[in-house]
Regions:
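Extended C-terminal regions of large enzymes
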Residues: 1-236
Length: 236
């Protein structure tokens, strides 16, 4: 239901969900009260999630604050480290502490904490085309750059990013060349992707972003995973 409301009202479900997570944490800490937010909002409450989706979609009451996103909301209430975001964009469901490559991708993505600008999860988790160990940071800078450049090329082609589960850059070049000209070789397509990425980065730099913005929330760097295969790890 909450996802439907997000789609119907032009709200990003990922950013909305992460912002609600921050609201629930602030509530459990006692920073926010039931009187302020209109409902008992213990973490995991489906009723609270639906309520927040409704008031955010309508811009009513506390929903106006939720609509500002987790970065502004948590800063307003004195706990900016609770915003799970990079460059103001909230993270999706992949924990950067247990998937080291995607953590670097979140930090360096030109548009913020986005998994679709370098989906290393394909290699680190789904093993497409081969598995790369997710728990180590070794080799991840090279992997992340390759994915980011390739994704930029794919996005510019108009193809759905999900096709990359089956196709690589050679397949993209093979389709572009007959349609657009023989100059679209594998090497040139790879260069196009890198150039697009660099132009985006140049735009960000001119807009005031610096290397300090290529970062992760403090808690991902200091609070270790408590259970599961990544137990004891932080983002490296």
């Amino acid at each position: 239901y909450a996802n439907l409301l997000c789609n119907e009202h032009g709200m990003d479900p990922i950013s909305f969900g992460a912002t609600i997570g921050a609201v629930m944490e602030l509530y459990e800490m006692g920073v926010l009260t039931k009187e302020q937010i209109g409902i008992d909002a213990k973490f995991g409450s489906a009723q609270a999630l639906a309520h927040f989706a409704e008031i955010t979609a309508k811009g009513e009451g506390f929903g106006k604050e939720i609509g500002q996103g987790s970065k502004r909301l948590t800063a307003k209430y004195g706990h900016p480290d609770l915003s799970m975001s990079s460059k103001g964009q909230e993270f999706p469901a992949y924990d950067a502490r247990g998937i080291q490559g995607i953590g670097l991708g979140y930090a360096t993505s030109n548009r913020g904490g986005c998994h679709l600008r370098g989906y290393t999860v394909a290699r680190e988790v789904a093993r497409i085309p081969v598995k790369t160990e997710p728990l180590t940071a070794d080799g991840k800078p090279e992997l992340v750059k390759a994915f980011q450049d390739a994704t930029a090329a794919y996005d510019s082609s108009g193809l759905c990013i999900f096709t990359t589960f089956a196709w690589g850059l050679p397949d993209l070049a093979d389709q572009l060349a007959p349609a657009c000209g023989p100059e679209f070789t594998l090497e040139n397509v790879a260069t196009i992707g890198e150039r697009i990425w660099n132009m985006e980065r140049d735009f960000n730099n001119r807009a005031g972003f610096t290397s300090k913005d290529d970062s992760l929330p403090k808690r991902l760097l200091t609070e270790a995973v408590k259970t599961g295969p990544a137990k004891g790890l932080v983002s490296k």
